């Protein structure tokens, strides 16, 4: 990971004002292609292509200023936690995890790079979301978060189950916009991977 960070790759598509290189999706796509070709076992997909993009999509100046510099420098590793380990569920289904009052409850599995990540972007439902759902930023080094390694078909990236029991959580983006953000993230992932 340090070699990847030294080359500036986590900063590729982050704006210069947040410590990034200010490049676009074309450059990010080239990097993603090289990672895929070499099967490099680092959290590039989960941290750079998924979680960082989710934070950027939320378009919140304060959250961008707080999280993007650490992600650009590679000091902070993030992951996207939306799967709930239930057969037949889609990324666009309402999550079972519950958020509200700055706390999160529920379970996400499998979570790529869930053991290496410092923070997770988690899909969850709260009273404010109406019929939709939202996204939450959850620092993973805290009481209320339990991580357990999981066996997965993907042998390149380690997967985990993340259990949230009243974990401190910060809303990412506007309430009820989870499905819209998820659809955009899936579009981005389809292009970049």
Q: PLM features: residue spans?
A:
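Cytochrome P450 C-terminal beta-domain/meander region
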Residues: 90-105
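Glycine-rich beta->alpha junctions and the first turn(s) of the following alpha-helix
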Residues: 37, 145-193
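A short, Trp-centered hydrophobic/proline-enriched beta-strand micro-motif
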Residues: 74-85
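A short core secondary-structure module
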Residues: 81, 107-146
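Buried hydrophobic positions in well-ordered alpha/beta secondary-structure cores of metabolic enzymes
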Residues: 8, 15, 31, 60, ...
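Short beta-strand-to-turn element immediately C-terminal to the catalytic PLP-Schiff-base lysine
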Residues: 56-59, 122-125, 137-140, 163-165, ...
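Short glycine/proline-enriched turns and hinge-like loops at secondary-structure junctions
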Residues: 23, 90-92, 113-117, 131-132, ...
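Internal helix-loop-helix
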Residues: 5-65, 69, 73, 113-116
């Amino acid at each position: 990971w340090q070699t990847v960070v030294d080359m500036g790759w986590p900063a590729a598509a982050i704006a210069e004002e947040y410590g990034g290189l200010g490049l676009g999706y074309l450059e990010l796509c080239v990097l993603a292609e090289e990672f895929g070709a070499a099967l490099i076992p680092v959290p590039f997909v989960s941290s750079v292509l998924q979680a960082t993009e989710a934070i950027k999509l939320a378009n919140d100046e304060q959250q961008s200023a707080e999280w993007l510099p650490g992600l650009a420098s590679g000091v902070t590793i993030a992951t996207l936690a939306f799967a709930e380990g239930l057969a037949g569920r889609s990324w666009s289904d309402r999550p079972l995890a519950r958020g509200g009052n700055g706390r999160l409850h529920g379970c996400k599995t499998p979570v790529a790079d869930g053991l290496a990540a410092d923070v997770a972007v988690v899909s969850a439902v709260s009273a404010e979301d109406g019929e939709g759902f939202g996204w939450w930023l959850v620092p993973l080094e805290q009481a209320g978060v339990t991580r357990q390694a999981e066996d997965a078909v993907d042998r390149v990236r380690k997967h985990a189950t993340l259990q949230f029991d009243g974990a401190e959580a910060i809303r990412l983006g506007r309430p009820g916009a989870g499905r819209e953000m998820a659809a955009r993230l899936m579009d981005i992932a389809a292009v970049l991977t």
